[in-house]
Amino acid sequence: MATNAGYLRCKEERKNESFFKVVQSINVSSENKRALPHDFSRSFTDKELSRKMKIRAQWGNSWEVGISKNPRFYFMEKSGWEKFVRDNALGNSELLTFTHKGKMHFTVNIFKLDGKEMMQPPQSRSFFASSSRIKTEQEENDIKEEVVVSSNRGQTTAAESKGRKLNLGKRAAKESQSSKRTEKVVRARSDYAGASSSTAAAFTILFKQGYLVFLRIPNSVSKDQVPDEKTVFKIHHPNGKKSWNVVYLERFGAFSGGWRRVVKEYPLAVGDTCKFTFIKPKELLLVVSKP
């Protein structure tokens, strides 16, 4: 039986110490906001914590950040931390997860406010302005091209029309089969459902390495489906034998306490497609498709 490399990597990551930070512009310089969690710090010796942290991003860039201690806690030194924040244009409530790889070396996963992970360094302001201008010009050209093509297309032949109808029919049949499979899973949990599968809200997330500790919910979902306060959700396995309580933190728009247990016991692995369907206001059915 073939081994899922992503699952093994994910399983190994769970053994490593990790913590998270949410970066806002108003607290970049705050010593409290640069603190290392107490439970995390006590996993290391004073000698280890006297070293500099080496933080490595997904795209290979790295930063060194010194660690200091006050009477209450260890914290990341301002100079190194501010450079890391500045280089990555952070400060808009990004969620960062830090995973210890040994000898105070850390990998960092950065998730933007919309829930998407940063997989490359941010570009300069001039680049964005240039890109925006190019994109606008390209869109205008595309519109002009579409108008010209449409005006020159003329009447569609009977063969082309018939071919399109056949393709549409095949696509509709395929989508219908997929819809029926989804409805079957939801009906299997109908004892929990407060609404039919056709009206149930759902969202899909591709599981990444950074989701081991926290899972950020898409903004569109959190605004429409999730209470604007700390809430406990129940996540159900489709086999009906497993369920987990997970804490949703409205400040971060993410599943927090209990989420690591879901990852471990479901289990989830890097590359999995995770579909969450609301079967009650505070209950979700999690269906996972393996790559």
Swiss-Prot record:
- Show the SUPFAM superfamilies listed in the entry: DNA-binding pseudobarrel domain (SSF101936)
Q: List the disulfide bonds.
A: none
Protein's UniProt keywords contain Nucleus: yes
Keyword field: DNA-binding, Nucleus, Repeat, Transcription, Transcription regulation
GO MF annotations for this entry? DNA binding
- Region (Disordered) residue ranges read 149-182
- Enumerate composition-biased segments (Polar residues): 149-159
In Swiss-Prot or TrEMBL terms, this protein is called: B3 domain-containing protein At2g16210
